[in-house]
Every structure is written in structure tokens, then in C-alpha cells.
């Protein structure tokens, strides 16, 4: 997994036309991808433990997880236009949201727009300041730990013998 992430980010960096020495976003992007991948692996483990090997049910659950991530991930529907329950509660568990927002902040934030200008991309996503990047990293780490602990708890519950 790590080798694939390193290769993916290196290829993207090579074809971006901006060398890493000036952009300085290679290793932070690797960190974002590793945290996002580890968190999504935890979600997959929880889903596979819950459906107990039923492939059709796992496919339906996977599609539901995908659509929920697409809705709450600030991809197609802007979060600031949604109801506060979706925006403030459910979107905190969207791994895609925090991965996207952190990578967008690396690309367009941190003073890249000079002279008091505001990036149109960050404005449309309602990202106000650069400190949101660290919030995204913290939430990715929290989601990773939460999903891994949930998978471990479910696995422990499933394999533990029932005492009657």
C-alpha cells in the first residue's frame, strides 16, 4: 500500500509541472493518502465483519458507503448548503471530505494567493483559513482510529464464545 501511494503521488507530482522543491506538498500528500487509505480500510473491515461473508449484501453496503461519502464529502454537493445535521454531525465521519479538503488546502492554501486575494476553490468549499488543514489531519486520524477500533471490537465480539 505504501509503495503504491508513494508512486501515485510521485507520478502526480511529476506531471503537475511544478517541482516538489517549490510546491513542498509531496510528503504531506503522502500523509493524507496514507491516513485516508487506512481509515477506508477500517470502514471496509467493519462492513465485511457486519455482513458475515454475504457478497451481495457487502456490495449493497459498499455502494451505500460510497454514496454517503459522495454526499457528505464536499465533492458534488457543497456542505455549507446542507442541513446542519448533515453538515455538522454526519460529515464529521466522512473520510473523503477530510482527504479532499486537506489536499485542496495544500494546493490552494497557505499563502499561494497573494495580495489579499481569496482562492475561488477555497471560497466555493467554504474553507476560511489554513488552520482547517490541521483539523482535517486530526479528523482523518480520529476516523482511522475509530474505524479500526470498531473493527477490532466487532471481530472480538464475533469470535468470542457465547457463554450461556
Which residues does each predicted region cover?
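Membrane-spanning alpha-helical segments of multipass transporters and channels
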Residues: 1-164
Amino acid at each position: 500500500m505504501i509503495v503504491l501511494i508513494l508512486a501515485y503521488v510521485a507520478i502526480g507530482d511529476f506531471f503537475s509541472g511544478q517541482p516538489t522543491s517549490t510546491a513542498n506538498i509531496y510528503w504531506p500528500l503522502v500523509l493524507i493518502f496514507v491516513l485516508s487509505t487506512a481509515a477506508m480500510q477500517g470502514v471496509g473491515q467493519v462492513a465485511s465483519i457486519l455482513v458475515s461473508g454475504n457478497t451481495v449484501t457487502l456490495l449493497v453496503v459498499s455502494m451505500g458507503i460510497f454514496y454517503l461519502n459522495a454526499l457528505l464529502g464536499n465533492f458534488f454537493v457543497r456542505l455549507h448548503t446542507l442541513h446542519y445535521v448533515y453538515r455538522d454531525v454526519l460529515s464529521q465521519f466522512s473520510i473523503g471530505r477530510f482527504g479532499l479538503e486537506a489536499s485542496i488546502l495544500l494546493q490552494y492554501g497557505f499563502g499561494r494567493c497573494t495580495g489579499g486575494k481569496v482562492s475561488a476553490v477555497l471560497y466555493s468549499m467554504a474553507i476560511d483559513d489554513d488552520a482547517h488543514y490541521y483539523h482535517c489531519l486530526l479528523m482523518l486520524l480520529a476516523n482511522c482510529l475509530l474505524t479500526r477500533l470498531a473493527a477490532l471490537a466487532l471481530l472480538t465480539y464475533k469470535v468470542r464464545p457465547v457463554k450461556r
